[in-house]
From Swiss-Prot:
EC numbers, comma separated: 4.2.1.134
Entries under PANTHER family matching the protein: VERY-LONG-CHAIN (3R)-3-HYDROXYACYL-COA DEHYDRATASE
Gene Ontology CC entries for this record: endoplasmic reticulum membrane; nucleus
Protein name (record): Very-long-chain (3R)-3-hydroxyacyl-CoA dehydratase PASTICCINO 2
Described purpose of this protein according to its UniProt entry: Catalyzes the third of the four reactions of the long-chain fatty acids elongation cycle. This endoplasmic reticulum-bound enzymatic process, allows the addition of two carbons to the chain of long- and very long-chain fatty acids/VLCFAs per cycle. This enzyme catalyzes the dehydration of the 3-hydroxyacyl-CoA intermediate into trans-2,3-enoyl-CoA, within each cycle of fatty acid elongation. Thereby, it participates in the production of VLCFAs of different chain lengths that are involved in multiple biological processes as precursors of membrane lipids and lipid mediators.
Reported effect, residue 72 to F: Loss of proliferation control
Active site: 147, 154
Length: 221
């Protein structure tokens, strides 16, 4: 029975990784094609649906960690996925005013290259039991450039959205109401920005540690 469940797990994770890989490959292709043909102002319109699908599919990774399908700690996975979902739905989907900014293009390209490398790496690992050495190096080295460009784009887009969040009062809840509860999305977004200050360096150091362990292990093998 344990052997059968192991096979089911590997088949499921193989399919999951390659399906999401295909989604991010589509995002990258559409972003680059649109950038070349009509400019960065139109990139979001071209990639909106594929981006939403590919990024929202990452929610399953939290469940994978919770039920033990993968060894990735939820404490590391949750903030990464949470911040991306916040950008995808809370900023880009909700505030069209920022969609034509060039930071959308740098964000999407940084995210998609990162995820194409990551999902194909784990796709090979689950399907074949290993990944090529060059793929391992890419998996644990590409973040050195792509994480800073991605984070810079995220912070920039959140900052650009702040005036529109404040004037629209979208997602804010004012008193009085039946629940006797108030919520200000503008100040919540400022709090999210503040979390980036300690959170980004911490995550970068975490990934540097991952890189050191993974590459050291590959040299020993």
């Amino acid at each position: 029975m344990a052997g059968f469940l192991s096979v089911v797990r590997r088949v499921y994770l193989t399919l999951y990784n390659w399906i999401v890989f295909a989604g991010w490959a589509q995002v990258l292709y559409l972003a680059i094609t649109t950038l070349k043909e009509t400019g960065y102002e139109n990139v979001y319109d071209a990639i909106e649906k594929p981006l939403q699908l590919a990024q929202t599919a990452a929610v399953l990774e939290i469940l994978h960690g919770l039920v033990g399908l993968v060894r990735s700690p939820v404490s590391a996975t949750l903030p990464q996925i949470g911040s991306r979902l916040f950008l995808t739905w809370g900023i880009l989907y909700s505030f069209p005013e920022v969609r034509s900014h060039f930071l959308v293009t740098s964000l999407v390209i940084s995210w998609s290259i990162t995820e194409i490398i990551r999902y194909s790496f784990f796709g090979f690992k689950e399907a074949l039991g290993f990944a090529p050495s060059w793929h391992l190096w890419l998996r644990y080295s590409s973040f050195l450039l792509l994480y800073p460009t991605g984070i810079t784009s995220e912070v920039g887009l959140i900052y650009l959205a702040l005036p529109h969040i404040k004037t629209s009062e979208m997602y804010s809840v004012r008193m009085p109401n039946i629940l006797n509860f108030s919520f200000d999305f503008f100040y919540a977004t400022i709090l999210v920005l503040a979390i980036y200050v300690p959170g980004s360096p911490h995550m970068y150091r975490y990934m540097l540690g991952q890189r050191k362990r993974a590459l050291s292990k590959s040299k020993r093998e």
